[in-house]
Amino acid sequence: MIKQDVSMKLVSSQSDGEQKESTELLSKAVYEKTLNGYKLTYDESEATGYNGSTTTIELFDGKKVVMSRTGSVISNLVVELGKKHHCVYGTPYGDLMVGVNANYIHSNLDDNGGKLDFKYVIDVNSSYIGDFDISIEVK
C-alpha cells in the first residue's frame, strides 16, 4: 500500500476524575502502511488549538501507539501496553514532561482503513493529571 488520502474522525475524551470533556475532529489525512503497522498524518487547525502543527499517529504491532506533533507545538507521546514512558507534551503555553501509562490499545486497521482505540493515563511528577480515551476511524 502506498500513501493514500483518507477521511478520519478522531474523538478524544479526557477526565480528571471529576469532569469529563470530549472533542471530535473530522479531517483529511494521509494514511500509509509501515513495516510494523500503520501511520496517519494530519494538519491541526484552530479548532484543535494547535493551528500550524502536523500530527502523526503511528501504530506498532498493535501494542504501541506513538503520537508526534511538529510545527508550532512539538509533542511526542508513547502509549505502550506494559510500559511507562516519560514524554514531552507540548502545549500552546509551553512544554511538560509527562508520564504515560497505557490502559488499552485495540485496532482493526488494515490497508483499507478501520478503527484504532486507545486509553492512557498521564501524570506529572507522579501526580495524576487525567485519563485520556482516543478513538480514530479511518475511511
Residue locations for each model-derived region?
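Flexible glycine-rich active-site/ligand-binding loops centered on an Asp-His dyad
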Residues: 135-139
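N-terminal intrinsically disordered, cationic/polar leader segments
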Residues: 1-117, 121-123, 127-129
